[in-house]
A protein has these predicted regions:
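N-terminal positive-inside, membrane-proximal cytosolic segments immediately preceding the first
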Residues: 1-36
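TPR-repeat structural position
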Residues: 75-76, 82, 119, 155, ...
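Short solvent-exposed coil/turn linkers within tandem alpha-helical repeat scaffolds
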Residues: 93-102, 116, 130-139, 166-175, ...
Length: 235
């Protein structure tokens, strides 16, 4: 065996010996640490399967009932408040707010309140809703929140939120529509230069969106909607 090989074996043996020495020296501390990890992991599983998961399942069940009985029939008041033994969205959001289903209940409650014209209450629920990184849901929630801000005359917030929704969605046509809503509000605020910039951005970034496409009516080809708004503010 070569001297280099002997040296390598010595290095390995020395490393192992040091490791064994460390284990012997700190045996009590290491065992304590392992037990602590086991307790944490065990506690986590106990929480998930003994408390968290049952709550999630129950919240999903209650949300499904409320959605089927009231949302589908557009009975927004009962959807919010419930009826008899059926919990409404407000109660589900309050009792199970830490669960995914309880979180969705906040979003649905916000939409129901908006439909009922209770925009300030709707805003509270929609602001409290967590999108949890889902781009589709995030864009829809931001769009709903922007509409609530607009209805509540919080126009600057509405514009900013429409723009955020446009960035969040991965559907170009929706991005164009959300930005268009922001442009309309800016026009309403007499901020024509800013509105024009938004309209020009729509035309440049989303040329295939319906709002940017020319429309045919019989033998007549109409200009794209966005072109009309750009022309109006360019004069």
């Amino acid at each position: 065996m070569s001297k280099q090989a002997n040296n390598q074996n010595l290095d390995v043996n020395e490393t192992l010996a040091k490791s064994e020495a460390i284990i012997v020296k700190y045996k009590k501390q290491i065992i304590t640490a392992i037990v602590a990890i086991a307790v944490v992991v065990g506690g986590t599983f106990a929480y998930i399967y003994g408390y968290s998961k049952p709550r999630e399942d129950k919240a999903q069940e209650l949300l499904g009932i409320a959605m089927q009985k009231y949302i589908m029939t557009q009975d927004y008041e009962k959807a919010l408040k419930g009826e008899g033994k059926t919990l409404g969205l407000e109660a589900i959001a309050s009792k199970y707010g830490s669960t995914d289903a309880g979180n969705v209940a906040k979003y649905e409650a916000g939409l129901c309140l908006y439909q009922l014209g209770k925009t300030k209450e709707a805003i509270k629920y929609l602001e409290d809703f967590s999108t949890q990184g889902d781009a589709t849901i995030s864009a829809q929630a931001l769009f709903a929140l922007a509409n609530c801000y607009a209805a509540d005359k919080q126009l600057d917030k509405a514009v900013d939120t429409f723009k955020k929704a446009a960035k969040e969605t991965n559907v170009p046509a929706r991005s164009a529509e959300y930005l268009f809503q922001a442009g309309l509000i800016l026009e309403n605020q007499k901020k024509n230069d800013e509105a024009l910039q938004v309209y020009q951005q729509i035309k440049a970034d989303y040329p295939l969106a319906p709002i940017c496409s020319r429309q045919q009516q019989g033998d007549v080809v109409l200009d794209a909607i966005i072109d009309k708004y750009i022309e109006k503010l360019s004069k």
